[in-house]
Amino acid sequence: MVLSDAEWQLVLNIWAKVEADVAGHGQDILIRLFKGHPETLEKFDKFKHLKTEAEMKASEDLKKHGNTVLTALGGILKKKGHHEAELKPLAQSHATKHKIPIKYLEFISDAIIHVLHSRHPGDFGADAQAAMNKALELFRKDIAAKYKELGFQG
């Protein structure tokens, strides 16, 4: 799967909006993930106790983790598909330490699209959404290949 230069530009244009408030976007995305797929919360020992959206919004740890997640993703997206060096340690930790199934990466991808659309409706139209979906699908495909190399059937 390859994105055109124009598609990558759409991805990076919306990502510039994310970078104005990485932690806030990350927190919103994690809240959307946990509300939509409560089973994903079980993978996070330090967040398991957060049961309500209000508790999640009040959690500085959740906000920090959202910042970490989106900072890593931003670094990958900026490589425009040439993300081997960034992907390898991420796949290693998510396969061997955290044991995060690929399905959960699909769930967070959906949460990313939803939050970007809700926060930036004028800047995240159908073309930008399609480009971001394609970029996230490329990321998932490549991380799934790394999982396979590591013997993780996530």
UniProtKB/Swiss-Prot annotation:
<dbReference type="GO" id="GO:0019430">
    <property type="term" value="P:removal of superoxide radicals"/>
</dbReference>
<dbReference type="GO" id="GO:0016528">
    <property type="term" value="C:sarcoplasm"/>
</dbReference>
<keyword id="KW-0597">Phosphoprotein</keyword>
<keyword id="KW-0349">Heme</keyword>
<comment type="function">
    <text>Monomeric heme protein which primary function is to store oxygen and facilitate its diffusion within muscle tissues. Reversibly binds oxygen through a pentacoordinated heme iron and enables its timely and efficient release as needed during periods of heightened demand. Depending on the oxidative conditions of tissues and cells, and in addition to its ability to bind oxygen, it also has a nitrite reductase activity whereby it regulates the production of bioactive nitric oxide.</text>
</comment>
<feature type="modified residue" description="Phosphoserine">
    <location>
        <position position="4"/>
    </location>
</feature>
<dbReference type="GO" id="GO:0005344">
    <property type="term" value="F:oxygen carrier activity"/>
</dbReference>
<feature type="binding site">
    <location>
        <position position="65"/>
    </location>
    <ligand>
        <name>nitrite</name>
    </ligand>
</feature>
<keyword id="KW-0408">Iron</keyword>
<feature type="domain" description="Globin">
    <location>
        <begin position="2"/>
        <end position="148"/>
    </location>
</feature>
<keyword id="KW-0561">Oxygen transport</keyword>
<dbReference type="InterPro" id="IPR000971">
    <property type="entry name" value="Globin"/>
</dbReference>
<dbReference type="GO" id="GO:0070062">
    <property type="term" value="C:extracellular exosome"/>
</dbReference>
<feature type="modified residue" description="Phosphothreonine">
    <location>
        <position position="68"/>
    </location>
</feature>
<dbReference type="GO" id="GO:0004601">
    <property type="term" value="F:peroxidase activity"/>
</dbReference>
<keyword id="KW-0514">Muscle protein</keyword>
<keyword id="KW-0963">Cytoplasm</keyword>
<dbReference type="InterPro" id="IPR002335">
    <property type="entry name" value="Myoglobin"/>
</dbReference>
<keyword id="KW-0479">Metal-binding</keyword>
<feature type="binding site">
    <location>
        <position position="65"/>
    </location>
    <ligand>
        <name>O2</name>
    </ligand>
</feature>
<comment type="subunit">
    <text>Monomeric.</text>
</comment>
<dbReference type="Pfam" id="PF00042">
    <property type="entry name" value="Globin"/>
</dbReference>
<dbReference type="GO" id="GO:0019825">
    <property type="term" value="F:oxygen binding"/>
</dbReference>
<protein>
    <recommendedName>
        <fullName>Myoglobin</fullName>
        <ecNumber>1.7.-.-</ecNumber>
        <ecNumber>1.11.1.-</ecNumber>
    </recommendedName>
</protein>
<dbReference type="InterPro" id="IPR009050">
    <property type="entry name" value="Globin-like_sf"/>
</dbReference>
<keyword id="KW-0560">Oxidoreductase</keyword>
<keyword id="KW-0813">Transport</keyword>
<dbReference type="GO" id="GO:0020037">
    <property type="term" value="F:heme binding"/>
</dbReference>
<feature type="binding site" description="proximal binding residue">
    <location>
        <position position="94"/>
    </location>
    <ligand>
        <name>heme b</name>
    </ligand>
</feature>
<dbReference type="GO" id="GO:0098809">
    <property type="term" value="F:nitrite reductase activity"/>
</dbReference>
<comment type="similarity">
    <text>Belongs to the globin family.</text>
</comment>
<dbReference type="GO" id="GO:0046872">
    <property type="term" value="F:metal ion binding"/>
</dbReference>
